[in-house]
């Protein structure tokens, strides 16, 4: 109901006085004393009047004297409560409690009033804010001065004063709105309290408590209202993460237990020197000491270390584990890697390892160590954890955070809409009141004046009301006071607004404005439009509008004409591109001539852009030039370029050159994709403003926490983490480095710095701090950032790229050039034709014909004349181009009409051919993939429509023509008559070949050969040279496959013809592969197989598996989706490359040639600058020492290598070396110094934020958006259904798949029956679940170094649990009999029990006979499977797993595609990188020597992990990095060098394909299905409700008949749980449901389920057809036609019963009347015979007894009545009385019971159905 607003009056704001308090108290007492019969609905506080919000506009501005003083509450909800408000400056509402503060200070106490004035004063808030910021700055000082203690006391005093002010003004804790009732004040109170505790009480761990001071930074959140909103949203999102957190922790616990069982103790396996050398034995014997084996293996000198490694080399005893070098043996010794923190020895450390693995932080290190220690086969464990944990669970957190924040946004939007609606209602009421006032005023004037005066004054009144220019006019005159209307007002002419500006308000109108709730003036609108004073606008117009004289104006017009021409924009765009190209070709080293060329080019381009700016200023005048954002941007860049030219000789000014790169953003004016994406980023940054501040505060706080807690520890215990006892690069000894560590943790790299922290600062404290950083900063905040960024990618934004019809200048210029080209072509062709005809003496065609042809050809290339805006048409000079859309020359695919625009006939024919190759179903002769034309391919659409119109042609069984018409026209002998002779034989041969290649067996055979040939490629590893027999077999097999594919190709040539074969893309792929194979065989026969070119051709065979793409339906769907996404992906890739180009060129300017260093070749250590200062010193030492002047492999020496560096930084792999080199760099050819250039860290921080975070997430956004758009195009049915219908459809879909399972009958045997009752009780399940949890805890307490006693106890506990679960299984088997195996969970339990028993029995045998422990470990995993039974007890977890199950089919398809990509790249890797030097990430396990090792490496790179280490050896080109002549044992291949071009291309392309595309498709599908699962779980009915219905049905339908007795229906629906439950009394509601009742009074399962579902969801007529179809399906699945036929419905049954009740009542009344009449007759007889007596009306009178018998239901009176009546009837009748002819001598028993049963109609009661049935039968 709309609230009523009266006109605003000053008395609306009333002071809060003692009288006000007495009124509130009196009203409260009155309300308590009043007992109202009907409870009033509970009111709620108004949202717009909450504390902290601004006063709604409708109330206007309160008078100045009422600010900052207590006022009566405006909210009606608080009118009856002891509260008051204070409105501060800015009209902010502050609400206070009216009770005494601290039981002393009343609201009228001067001290409290003073505290309130201070508290609400904005200056106080600014002072506190300044104090907080100052305090934060002081806390960041590493070595505070001596007077810092005084400053600290000052801050403490200020905070104490703030708390005192708040407590005095609000009260402490008793009552609403007191100090401690606000959670934000808890922070203030705790900070101040802890400050005093740490100052005055001597505590040991003072540093930990003093860390509370850091939380003062959080006080900044309390000052800004927007930040409070963000924090509330974050807290709400964390609340909603409950189910995901539980599932994540549960999954991690299960994986942790599995990891413990598989890898416990493995990471301690090290290579120990063995056998023991004679020197050691001699030493022991000389000193007569016994040999200490433990000390020997623990001694690090006896362990094998790789160069530069901190931990000993791991190894394993499995066949596929890492091996030790000669002279070493694998033993368990020493501590675990990484200071002992990386291990699987107990639950806690294993959980940390798995948590790190799930977050993918340096997981390649854990992966490599585990596979080396346990074996390559355990890669399967990591695949499961990565795909289920990392890809699924982490992205579920992203989805939950995004949905939670979206809900907060929706709630905020709803609140704003409610306020707007309330405001509109108030405005409407004010308008009506104002009209009434105006009408009254007119009426009073009309009654006082004459007719003429009346008309005149009335007209004036109208004018005064309508035209209030410059005068205050009421808001009632504005119909819609929204921003839209205000903007419309702003669009009025300048003259009116200027007139209105200088008028003065009258005092009377001002008084009226003060008394109105909300008043607007045109002056306010003009002020909002122009914030500066009018004088400034006059001055600007006079100075910056240059129209001084005629010649200048004439010159300006011509300059305007030139500068606004599209060709000028095209020229400037080309200059921008050329300028970027000039800057990007800068490299190191450069010769002087090249450098001079670049300098000259820079000068030329700077001159051009400066001239452009000057000419545009002349053309537009400065007044208009600087009103356009792009012009301002351009002027800044030009000014900086000119400044850079002037400062070019100064040191450090090269960075200014990089700023010229920003000019590339001007391409956004003509590049729609770039424009849209820049807008998205800008909008996201704007929308994320508050979130950015909160994230910055959190980073600041955690950096301070680390600095305060661990700063000193890093200095004291530095020798623990550094060999030279110098601080490492990552430490917390100062605030800046602490900030870098927190930022690195937010980037996902935290585990390495946490190891150092735990080593110097203690495990518990470091774990707590880091976990908070990861959970709050990484998982919540950054996911929220990503979610809001993705929300900017609405379909409207990205689809607008395609739908944008606006024509820019470059398109117009391009169109002009194309039209000129076409005109020249037509002119030349026409001239030549005319000349030829003239020579031949023929008459040339008329001009009209030529003109028509030219017009027709030019029609497609024309634009309407009004393509330009009005201001672009200068002096009537217009353009003749008339095509609304055309091709953009910068990015192909941007325009909607790629294929239509501006192509000649040959281009069109080529385009048609290409489209035909992908689109025509007949032409897909080498593929079963049907090309799906996208919306951007109109040509493909047209051809698709033609195909649909001509289906008969497509179904033709005859082959097509071999050659095109042009070929036959040029070579007529190709046209063969197929009706006779050789032509007929040729035609029959073609038809036979056509039949063969079209046969399914042929296709199956070819696919089999493709798979076989692909599998053969996997065997061609480095060991093939040692297996001569296999090598010969593979060579012959390769030839056989080649011959098979040649035959296939020849058959298809003959069958399909060249035209059709070579217009199919898949056939082209097949042709290339076969051609490469033919060339390989030919070269081997000729002896040229060792040539490099031939070897490269052989690698093309790796593409053979691509041929299988078209044969698998699942991969076909994924490929089609990928093909549809390629245009969007390419656009975003180009934008990312452009963004990165800026950073790359900036890196070249900053670091080119500066990454060189002089190193010791033995240890690879950088020599100190004291020994080597520059390159010359290093060169001098090279001749005498083992030193080298080397460059970092990945550097910024040119833009290309800069791109590679940025890719490593953006994927956080290999970025440390690059960043270290950057911060150590000095000048070119100078030796680096440790962190001499420390603030270069900021370059990488800025790039990570903008270059990595934004641009890489653009891929996710684009792929998800494209995926959703394609789904909308393909899922047509969903587009035509409403949301309610979708809910119905989902619910009905579940119902359709649901079938009433047979209930397991209770056994007849007594013992089995008792056991059945026990195992089916809910208590049994709860008991077993508790045992499973205890079992899980028992498994968690296992550890590697546990004592024998603990080991025996845990073993016995395991035996006990096995016995318990075995007994449970046996009991269930006994009770449920053969039905036990009909339940899936029972089968799972049975399998777990069997495997557990086998593991228990075999464990001794396995250990006794030293069988491989792998089998034993796998069997022990069965114990963990018991834990999975907990899933069925958790509804939320089942919902999330249901989302995963929904995703499985699509994920399987993507997995197939990913496997195919990995397979192909593995073959390429084996061909090119099998023999590279073992360096970096390449070793004896992780390499490309075999197919298995290649797959292990590529799985690692799939998550972008470790690719920098694998890339490093491929960048070696020659000595001394590698040896090109080294022999590889067992092979003929020489050398171990790589190929940088191949290596960079290989790894970059794989990362883009797998990490950025395929993995993101994986993420997109999971997010999509999570949304579906959440939608279904948030529906009124979900899967659990139907399961509950099913289980309840089985309790009533014990025999599983799928029918329920009608009389049991009320009890059944009452037994259901919410929301399906229909509580008693429910018979009337069941009747209204109108369910069918079949024979024998039964109701079917489906009818009840449909009826209950419809009751919950509501009824819609659209779903009737779906109901009928589901009924038909259910009837088909359960054929019982006779029994299923409905007899009646519940509604009809109720009507019949009600009709019977009506008949019974009428009959009862009839019987009653007869009985009373009969009793009266008998009474008369009695009185006549015996005479009148007293007490006739007493209780024992006959009528009274009869009435009592009838109405009190006392059947005992029936026999006395009959005994009294019978003797009376035997007496003779009195002749004077008329006896009725017929009357009942004896009331029948049935009737008596009926009357008794249904008597007392005045008492309302619910008749039971059993009674109704008896009545019906008795009457019948």
Curated annotation (Swiss-Prot):
IV repeats lie at residues 1304-1602. It is found in: Cell membrane. II repeats lie at residues 548-811. The sequence contains 4 internal repeats, each with 5 hydrophobic segments (S1, S2, S3, S5, S6) and one positively charged segment (S4). Segments S4 are probably the voltage-sensors and are characterized by a series of positively charged amino acids at every third position. Keywords: Cell membrane, Disulfide bond, Glycoprotein, Ion channel, Ion transport, Membrane, Repeat, Sodium, Sodium channel, Sodium transport, Transmembrane, Transmembrane helix, Transport, Voltage-gated channel. It is a multi-pass membrane protein. Mediates the voltage-dependent sodium ion permeability of excitable membranes. Assuming opened or closed conformations in response to the voltage difference across the membrane, the protein forms a sodium-selective channel through which Na(+) ions may pass in accordance with their electrochemical gradient. Residues 487-507 have a biased composition (Basic and acidic residues). Residues 347-371, 735-755, 1200-1221, 1491-1513 dip into the membrane without crossing it. Disulfide bonds join 271-324, 757-766. Residues 1-117, 172-176, 225-243, 403-557, 621-625, 672-690, 791-1004, 1059-1065, 1113-1131, 1265-1320, 1377-1380, 1438-1453, 1568-1820 are cytoplasmic. Residues 896-910, 942-953 have a biased composition (Acidic residues). Glycans are attached at residues 278, 288, 317, 591, 1160, 1174. GO terms for molecular function: voltage-gated sodium channel activity. The keyword Cell cycle does not apply. Residues 1490-1505 are annotated as: Non-homologous region of repeat IV. Residues 285-342 are annotated as: Non-homologous region of repeat I. GO terms for biological process: membrane depolarization during action potential; neuronal action potential. Residues 1172-1194 are annotated as: Non-homologous region of repeat III. It comes from the Eukaryota. This is Sodium channel protein. SUPFAM superfamilies: Voltage-gated potassium channels (SSF81324). Residues 483-507, 844-864, 891-959 are annotated as: Disordered. Belongs to the sodium channel (TC 1.A.1.10) family.
């Amino acid at each position: 109901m709309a609230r009523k607003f009266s006109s605003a009056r000053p008395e609306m704001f009333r002071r809060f006085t003692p009288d006000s308090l007495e009124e509130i108290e009196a009203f409260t007492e009155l309300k308590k004393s009043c007992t109202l019969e009907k409870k009033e609905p509970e009111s709620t506080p108004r949202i717009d009047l909450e504390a902290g919000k601004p006063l709604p506009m409708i109330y206007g501005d309160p008078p100045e004297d009422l600010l900052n003083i207590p006022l009566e509450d405006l909210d009606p909800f608080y009118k009856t409560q002891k509260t008051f408000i204070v409105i501060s400056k800015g009209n902010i509402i502050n609400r206070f409690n009216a009770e005494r503060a601290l039981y002393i200070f009343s609201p009228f106490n001067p001290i409290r009033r003073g505290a309130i004035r201070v508290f609400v004063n904005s200056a106080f808030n600014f002072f506190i804010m300044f104090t907080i910021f100052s305090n934060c700055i002081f806390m960041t000082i590493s070595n505070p001065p001596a007077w810092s203690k005084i400053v600290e006391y000052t801050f403490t005093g200020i905070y104490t004063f703030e708390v005192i002010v708040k407590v005095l003004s609000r009260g402490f804790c008793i009552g609403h709105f007191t100090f401690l009732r606000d959670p934000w004040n808890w922070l203030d109170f705790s900070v101040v309290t802890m400050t005093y505790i740490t100052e005055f009480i001597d505590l040991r761990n003072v540093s930990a408590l003093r860390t509370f001071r850091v939380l003062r930074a959080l006080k900044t959140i309390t000052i800004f209202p927007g930040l409070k909103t963000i924090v509330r949203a974050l807290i709400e999102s964390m609340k909603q993460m409950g189910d995901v957190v539980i599932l994540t922790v549960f999954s991690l616990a299960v994986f942790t237990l599995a990891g413990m069982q598989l890898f416990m103790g493995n990471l301690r396996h090290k290579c120990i020197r063995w056998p023991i050398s004679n020197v050691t034995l001699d030493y022991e014997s000389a000193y007569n000491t016994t040999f200490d084996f433990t000390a020997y293996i623990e001694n690090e000198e006896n362990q094998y270390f790789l160069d530069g490694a901190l931990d000993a080399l791991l190894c394993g005893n499995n066949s596929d584990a890492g091996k030790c070098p000669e002279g070493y043996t694998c033993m368990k010794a020493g501590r675990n890697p990484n200071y002992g923190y990386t291990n699987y020895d107990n639950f806690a450390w294993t959980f940390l390892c798995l948590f790190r693995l799930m977050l993918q932080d340096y997981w390649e290190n854990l992966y490599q160590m585990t596979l080396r220690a346990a074996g390559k086969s355990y890669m399967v464990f990591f695949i499961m954890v990565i795909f289920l944990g990392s890809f699924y669970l982490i992205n579920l957190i992203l989805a939950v955070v995004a949905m939670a924040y979206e809900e907060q946004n929706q709630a905020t939007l709803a609140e704003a809409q409610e306020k707007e609606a309330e405001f509109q209602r108030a405005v409407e009421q004010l308008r009506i009141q104002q009209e009434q006032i105006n009408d009254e005023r007119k009426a009073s004037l009309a009654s006082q004046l004459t007719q003429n005066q009346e008309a005149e004054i009335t007209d004036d009144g109208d004018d005064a009301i309508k035209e209030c220019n410059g005068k205050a006019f009421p808001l009632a005159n504005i119909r819609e006071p929204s921003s839209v209307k205000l903007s419309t007002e702003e669009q009025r002419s300048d003259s009116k607004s200027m007139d209105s500006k200088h008028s003065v308000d009258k005092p009377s109108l001002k008084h009226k404005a003060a008394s109105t709730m909300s008043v607007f003036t045109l002056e306010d609108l003009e002020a909002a439009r122009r914030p500066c004073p009018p004088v400034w606008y006059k001055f600007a117009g006079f100075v910056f509008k240059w129209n001084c004289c005629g010649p200048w104006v004439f010159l300006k017009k011509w300059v305007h004409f030139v500068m606004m021409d599209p060709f000028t924009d095209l020229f400037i765009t080309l200059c921008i591109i050329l300028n970027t190209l000039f800057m990007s070709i800068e490299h190191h080293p450069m010769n002087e001539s090249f450098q001079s060329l670049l300098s000259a080019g820079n000068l030329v381009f700077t001159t051009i852009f400066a001239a452009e700016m000057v000419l545009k200023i002349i053309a537009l005048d400065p007044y208009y030039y600087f009103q356009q954002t792009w012009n301002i941007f351009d002027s800044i860049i030009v000014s900086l370029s000119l400044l850079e030219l002037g400062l070019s000789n100064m040191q450090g000014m090269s960075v200014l050159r990089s700023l010229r790169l920003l000019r590339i953003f001007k391409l956004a004016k003509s590049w729609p994709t770039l424009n849209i994406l820049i807008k998205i980023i800008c909008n996201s940054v704007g929308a994320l403003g508050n979130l950015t501040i909160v994230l910055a505060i959190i980073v600041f706080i955690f950096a301070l926490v680390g600095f305060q807690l661990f700063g000193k520890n890093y200095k004291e215990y530095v020798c623990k983490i550094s060999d030279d006892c110098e601080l490492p690069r990552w430490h917390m000894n100062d605030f800046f480095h602490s900030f870098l560590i927190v930022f690195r943790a937010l980037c996902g790299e935290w585990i390495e710095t946490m190891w150092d922290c735990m080593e110097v600062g203690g495990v518990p404290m470091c774990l707590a701090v880091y976990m908070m950083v990861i959970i709050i900063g990484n998982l919540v905040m950054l996911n929220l950032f990503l979610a809001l960024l993705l929300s900017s990618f609405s379909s409207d934004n990205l689809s607008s790229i395609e739908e944008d019809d606006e024509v820019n200048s470059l398109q117009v210029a391009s169109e002009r050039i194309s039209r000129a080209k076409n005109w020249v072509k037509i002119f030349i062709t026409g001239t030549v034709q005319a000349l030829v005809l003239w020579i031949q003496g023929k008459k040339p065609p008329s001009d009209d014909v030529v003109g028509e042809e030219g017009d027709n050809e030019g029609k497609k290339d024309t634009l309407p004349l009004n393509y330009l805006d009005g201001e672009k048409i200068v002096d009537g000079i217009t353009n003749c181009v008339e095509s609304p859309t055309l091709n953009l020359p910068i990015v192909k695919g941007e325009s909607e009409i790629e294929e239509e625009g501006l192509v000649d006939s040959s281009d069109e024919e080529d385009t048609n051919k290409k489209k035909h190759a992908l689109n025509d179903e007949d032409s897909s002769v080498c593929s079963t993939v049907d090309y799906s034309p996208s919306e951007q391919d109109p040509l493909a659409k047209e051809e698709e429509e033609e195909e649909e119109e001509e289906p008969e042609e497509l179904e033709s069984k005859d082959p097509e023509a071999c050659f095109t018409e042009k070929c036959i026209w040029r070579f007529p002998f190709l046209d063969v008559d197929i009706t006779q002779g050789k032509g007929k034989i040729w035609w029959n041969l073609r038809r036979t070949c056509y039949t063969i290649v079209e046969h399914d067996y042929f296709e199956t055979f070819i696919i089999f050969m493709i798979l076989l040939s692909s599998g053969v490629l996997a065997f061609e590893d480095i060991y093939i040279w040692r297996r001569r027999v296999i090598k010969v077999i593979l060579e012959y097999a390769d030839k056989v496959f080649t011959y098979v594919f040649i035959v296939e190709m020849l058959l298809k040539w003959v069958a399909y013809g060249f035209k059709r074969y070579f217009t199919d893309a898949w056939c082209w792929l097949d042709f290339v592969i076969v051609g490469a194979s033919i060339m390989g065989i030919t070269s081997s026969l000729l002896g040229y197989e060792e040539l490099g070119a031939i070897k490269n051709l052989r690698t093309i065979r790796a593409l053979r598996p691509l041929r299988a793409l078209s044969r698998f339906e699942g991969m076909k769907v994924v490929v089609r989706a990928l093909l549809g996404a390629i245009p969007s992906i390419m656009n975003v890739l180009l934008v990312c490359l452009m963004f990165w180009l800026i950073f790359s060129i900036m890196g070249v300017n900053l670091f080119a040639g500066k990454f060189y260093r002089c190193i010791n070749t033995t240890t690879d250590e950088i020599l100190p600058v004291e020994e080597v200062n520059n390159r010359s010193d290093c060169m001098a030492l090279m001749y005498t020492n083992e030193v080298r002047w080397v460059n970092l492999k990945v550097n910024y020496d040119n833009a290309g290598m800069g791109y590679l560096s940025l890719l490593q930084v953006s994927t956080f792999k290999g970025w440390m070396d690059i960043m270290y080199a950057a911060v150590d760099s000095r000048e070119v050819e100078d030796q680096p110094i440790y962190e001499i250039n420390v603030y270069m860290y900021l370059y990488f921080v800025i790039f990570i934020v903008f270059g990595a975070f934004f641009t890489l997430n653009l891929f996710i956004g684009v792929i998800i958006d494209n995926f959703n758009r394609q789904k909308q195009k393909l899922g047509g049915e969903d587009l035509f259904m409403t949301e309610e219908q979708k809910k119905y459809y989902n619910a009905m879909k579940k119902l359709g798949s649901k079938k009433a399972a047979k209930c397991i009958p209770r056994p007849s045997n007594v013992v089995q029956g008792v056991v059945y009752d026990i195992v089916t009780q809910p208590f049994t399940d709860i008991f077993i679940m508790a045992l499973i949890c205890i079992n899980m805890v028992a498994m968690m307490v296992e550890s590697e170094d546990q004592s024998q006693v603990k080991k025996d106890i845990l073993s016995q506990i395991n035996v006990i649990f096995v016995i318990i679960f075995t007994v449970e299984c046996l009991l269930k088997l006994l009770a449920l009999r053969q039905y036990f195996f009909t339940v899936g969970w029972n089968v799972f339990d049975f399998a777990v029990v069997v495997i557990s028993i086998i593991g228990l029995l075999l464990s001794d045998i396995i250990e006794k006979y030293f069988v491989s422990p792998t089998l034993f470990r796998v069997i022990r995993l069965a114990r963990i499977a018991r834990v999975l039974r907990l899933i069925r007890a958790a509804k939320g977890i089942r919902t999330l797993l249901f989302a995963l199950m929904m995703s499985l089919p699509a994920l399987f398809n993507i997995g197939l595609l990913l496997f195919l990509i990995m397979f192909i790249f593995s073959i390429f890797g084996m061909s090119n990188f099998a023999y590279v030097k073992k360096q970096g990430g390449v070793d004896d396990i992780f390499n490309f020597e075999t197919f298995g090792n290649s797959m292990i490496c590529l799985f690692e790179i799939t998550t972008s992990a470790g690719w920098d280490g694998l890339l490093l050896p491929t960048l070696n080109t020659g000595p001394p990095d590698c040896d090109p002549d080294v022999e590889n044992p067992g092979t003929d291949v020489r050398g171990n060098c790589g190929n940088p071009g191949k290596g960079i291309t290989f790894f970059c392309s794989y990362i883009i394909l797998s990490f950025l595309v395929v993995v993101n498709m994986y993420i997109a599908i999971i997010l999509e299905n999570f949304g579906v699962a959440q939608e279904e779980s948030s529906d009124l009915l979900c899967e659990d409700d139907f399961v509950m219905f099913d289980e309840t049905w089985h309790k009533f339908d014990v025999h599983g008949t799928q029918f329920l007795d009608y009389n049991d229906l009320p009890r059944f629906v009452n037994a259901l749980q919410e929301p399906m439950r229909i509580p008693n009394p429910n018979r009337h509601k069941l009747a209204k449901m109108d369910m069918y009742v079949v024979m024998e009074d039964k109701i079917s399962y489906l009818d009840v389920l449909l009826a209950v579902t419809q009751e919950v969801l509501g009824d819609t007529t659209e779903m009737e057809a779906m109901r009928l179809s589901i009924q038909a399906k259910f009837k088909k699945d359960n054929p019982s036609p006779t029994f299923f036929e409905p007899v009646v419905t519940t509604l009809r049954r109720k009507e019949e019963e009600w009709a019977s009740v009506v008949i019974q009542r009428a009959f009862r009344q009839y019987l009653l009347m007869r009985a009373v009449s009969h009793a009266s007759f008998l009474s008369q007889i009695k009185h006549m015979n015996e005479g009148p007596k007293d007490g006739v009306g007493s209780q024992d009178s006959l009528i009274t007894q009869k009435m009592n018998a009838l109405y009190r239901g006392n059947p005992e009176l029936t026999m006395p009545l009959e005994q009294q009546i019978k003797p009376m009837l035997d007496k003779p009748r009195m002749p004077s009385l008329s006896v009725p002819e017929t009357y009942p001598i004896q009331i029948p028993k049935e009737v008596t019971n009926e009357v008794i049963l249904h008597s007392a109609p005045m008492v309302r009661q619910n008749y039971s159905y059993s009674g109704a049935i008896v009545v019906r039968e008795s009457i019948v």
